[in-house]
Amino acid sequence: MKPFLRSQLERYAQRLQELDFLLSREDIMADMQQYRSISREHAEVTQVAGRYARYQQREADLAGAREMLEDPDMAEMAQEEIHAAETELVQLEDELQRLLLPKDPDDERNAFIEIRAGTGGDESALFAGDLARMYTRYAATVGWKVEVMSANESEIGGYKEVVLRIEGQSGTGPSGSGVYGALKFESGGHRVQRVPATETQGRIHTSACTVAVMPEPDEHQAITLNPADLRIDTFRASGAGGQHINKTDSAVRVVHLPTGIVAECQDGRSQHSNKAKALQVLQARIQEKERSERAAKEAALRKGLIGSGDRSDRIRTYNFPQGRLTDHRINLTLYKLLAIMEGDLGEVLQALQHAREAELLAELGLE
């Protein structure tokens, strides 16, 4: 193990003692926000300290087994122990490196997924619907809840734009992340190549959608919106909606005047419900704009493999005639497209997580 990594790990046992003391203090227990924050850190530090203790134990086992080699009667057993200890030490070092990687505090949050039809007209809208279905089905496989926040449906099916809210427990995504941590690398341009249902000559068409994944702000993160900065319009809902459709001005559009960012919702039955949902999405979009601007500045200094998540970055191609999905950022190609479109997205998300971890390890000089 590199000395730098070992020196980092040595600090965790001491930090664990400090956190144990803090969690026993009455003033900390009385402040629920601070108590939750310290408890979260305590869980992370406990995990690292525990794995490092195991690493040190296996180092001691290895040293003992090497001494046993000098005894002819014990040599065979010692050789087996040496092999087992060396194998586990390699695995533990890799695990510890990943546990020390900088964490994005937003990874544990719920997320909004915004899917917009792009080039390709009706076919693009149909593909936007396919993507929404793919994410919804994946969410179901890992026990997440999906709520449609707003939807602008196309006349022939699919969506011109749809916003989903996905809620789930932390630790259920790849590498133990939450919803946002699992899905954040889905942001960007998604291209589809297939024969549209309306194509009579059997020609393959190319169309595209853009996806933006935004963390849902919690009550402590949420920005305060000045009512003077908002323009709120009501209008009659359109599209699927049952008997109430077009009878009341229940749909709501909110414009944030300083930024020009817009959010609307017409899925709920009441104006109050639609306004609340629109404001939720608006807050997430404003924060995502600030986040994207920061990411763009960082990307100008260092162009990462995964990219900045900008909508203009073409990240993936879905080729239906070949049954192929290609993620261009990490040169991943899978020939199981139909299964992926049915929600079998885990392998793709895991590969992106591992690529990002490898990037971070390289930056820290650990690989």
Curated annotation (Swiss-Prot):
Gene Ontology terms for molecular function: translation release factor activity, codon specific
Maturation and modification: Methylated by PrmC. Methylation increases the termination efficiency of RF1.
Keyword Ribosomal protein found: no
Record's subcellular location: Cytoplasm
InterPro entries assigned: PCRF, Pep_chain_release_fac_I, Pep_chain_release_fac_I_sf, Prokaryotic/Mito_RF, RF-1
Keywords assigned by UniProt, alphabetized: Cytoplasm, Methylation, Protein biosynthesis
Entry GO terms, CC: cytoplasm
Pfam families per the UniProt record, alphabetical: PCRF, RF-1
HAMAP family in alphabetical order: Rel_fac_1
Membership in a protein family: Belongs to the prokaryotic/mitochondrial release factor family.
Protein name, entry field: Peptide chain release factor 1
Organism per entry: Acidovorax sp. (strain JS42)
